């Protein structure tokens, strides 16, 4: 039995799955936590990866491995391959001003969307490089190469110390602001616009490219950004829109068309198969449920029970969930807000319901944006930690207006990386067709009132800088 390894280095933790390359059956797995924060030294990821690999029984017997990970994080290296400073992660919004400046300098969002498929916001890598150049010039002067979290971990696994050997894949490169998914080329002119000079950048590999080898000689796949890996790991069919409710919320679908959205709502990323992955991202997803549970002093099961005990629309109470600023819409300094607080709605059930509906309304807005840019949307595949909430599962169909499928809980990002590794080991034009467990299906009639209430309230928020 040939084995493959899939690695997911996420914001919170590192997961390693070892699967049968032919069937996809899980053989063993490991996990280790990452430190909190929006600024983390990559050595912490490497330490967690080693712990997770050890818990998973090692990689000596695998035929191939691939690493997927959180996107956009700026890993800045000097000429010797040493980390210059802790990585600024996707959820670090200090570069919001840099993003606004970059939009203006190129002539507007439409110019960026046409050039690289995405419009600058604080999440994307180039904005962090601009922030570094302006705010830490001594560190900026040391930078010889820049890469992303999964690139760096793959490079470390290969044993190389030469920055010229760093590799990446289309999906992760497409979130940098200096690589075009449409042309499959770097835009070094945009890198120089943002950072002031050129840098060594990872080679961008195709779906089955080899990024290096493990000590046992097994090939390392190109890896992927977390959302692209999740799309591969769920085995989504054409027209299946994946809604992932993790730290961030993501709505995405594989497509043959690269969207161009000058407003920046829909990001024109690439997927793991040579196609495109239009995606809408919100900064506030499962953390909204965490915050509501904390505020009410209950666990998540009780939060779900409370939410389902209140009527649809929460009798007019609306929670706008911009708890840590927001990326979609682009409001990095916004705060959350509760509207419609009356004597009737002043109880835990209404607040719980408003929290679930507010989070889902933000994601439903993302679905609308994908469809407006040509995406096919037949069903919703709901994954991530937030999908474990019974309230989320039962309320979602009324907001999305489509059947909602919930696969069994799993490590879909790591599974996608493992499936890619099996593809690299086997070769061929398509990834292996692994069998999957049947999902639970939830259906309900749409309730337009909920979306209408949210639309009326979402612009009435307070800027945290005032």
Swiss-Prot record:
The keyword Glycoprotein does not apply. It catalyses: D-xylulose + ATP = D-xylulose 5-phosphate + ADP + H(+). Pfam families: FGGY_C, FGGY_N. It is an enzyme of class 2 (transferase). InterPro entries: ATPase_NBD (IPR043129), Carb_kinase_FGGY (IPR000577), Carb_kinase_FGGY_CS (IPR018483), FGGY_C (IPR018485), FGGY_Carb_Kinase (IPR050406), FGGY_N (IPR018484), Xylulokinase (IPR006000). The record marks 8 as: Important for activity. The keyword Transferase applies. GO terms for biological process: D-xylose metabolic process; xylulose catabolic process. Substrate binds at residues 71-72. The active site is at 226 (proton acceptor). One of its GO terms (molecular function) is D-xylulokinase activity. Keywords: ATP-binding, Carbohydrate metabolism, Kinase, Nucleotide-binding, Transferase, Xylose metabolism. Its EC number is 2.7.1.17. Belongs to the FGGY kinase family. Catalyzes the phosphorylation of D-xylulose to D-xylulose 5-phosphate. HAMAP family: XylB. This is Xylulose kinase. It comes from Actinoplanes missouriensis (strain ATCC 14538 / DSM 43046 / CBS 188.64 / JCM 3121 / NBRC 102363 / NCIMB 12654 / NRRL B-3342 / UNCC 431).
């Amino acid at each position: 039995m040939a084995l493959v390894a899939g690695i997911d280095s996420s914001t919170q933790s590192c997961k390693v799955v070892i699967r049968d390359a032919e069937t996809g059956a899980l053989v063993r797995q490991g996990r280790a936590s990452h430190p909190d924060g929006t600024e983390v030294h990559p050595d912490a990821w490497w330490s967690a990866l080693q712990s997770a690999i050890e818990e998973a029984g090692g990689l000596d017997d695998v035929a191939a491995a691939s690493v997927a990970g959180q996107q956009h994080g700026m890993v800045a290296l000097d000429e010797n391959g040493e980390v210059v400073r802790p990585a600024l992660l996707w959820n670090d919004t200090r570069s919001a001003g840099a993003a606004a400046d970059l939009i203006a300098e190129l002539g507007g969002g439409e110019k960026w969307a046409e050039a690289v498929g995405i419009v600058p916001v604080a999440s994307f890598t180039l904005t962090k490089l601009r922030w570094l150049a302006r705010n830490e010039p001594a560190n900026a002067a040391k930078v010889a190469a820049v890469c992303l979290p999964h690139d760096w971990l793959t490079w470390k696994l290969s044993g190389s110390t030469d920055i010229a050997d760093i590799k990446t894949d289309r999906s992760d490169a497409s979130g940098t602001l200096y690589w075009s998914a449409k042309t499959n080329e770097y835009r070094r002119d945009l890198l120089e616009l943002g950072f002031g000079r050129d840098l060594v950048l990872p080679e961008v590999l195709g779906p089955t490219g080899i990024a290096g080898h493990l000590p046992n000689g097994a090939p390392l796949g190109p890896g992927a950004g977390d959302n692209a890996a999740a799309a591969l790991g769920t085995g989504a069919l054409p027209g299946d829109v994946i809604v992932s409710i993790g730290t961030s919320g993501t709505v995405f679908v594989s497509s043959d068309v690269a969207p161009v959205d000058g407003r920046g709502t829909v990001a024109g990323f690439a997927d793991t198969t040579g196609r495109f992955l239009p995606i809408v991202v919100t900064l506030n997803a499962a953390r909204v449920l965490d915050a509501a549970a904390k505020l009410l002093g209950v666990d998540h099961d009780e939060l779900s029970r409370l939410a389902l005990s209140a009527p649809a629309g929460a009798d007019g109470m609306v929670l706008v969930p911009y708890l840590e600023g927001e990326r979609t819409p682009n409001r990095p300094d916004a705060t959350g807000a509760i509207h419609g607080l009356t004597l009737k709605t002043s109880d835990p059930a209404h607040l719980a319901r408003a929290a679930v509906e507010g989070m889902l309304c933000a994601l439903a807005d993302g679905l609308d944006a994908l469809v407006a840019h040509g995406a096919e949307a037949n069903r919703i595949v709901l994954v991530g930690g937030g999908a474990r909430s019974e309230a989320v599962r039962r309320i979602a169909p009324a907001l999305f207006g489509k059947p909602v499928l919930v696969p069994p809980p799993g490590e879909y990002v790591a599974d996608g990386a493992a499936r890619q590794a099996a593809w690299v080991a086997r070769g061929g034009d398509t990834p292996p067709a692994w069998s999957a467990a049947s999902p639970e299906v939830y259906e309900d009639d749409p309730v337009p009132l909920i979306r209408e209430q949210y639309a009326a309230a979402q612009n009435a928020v307070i800027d945290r800088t005032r």
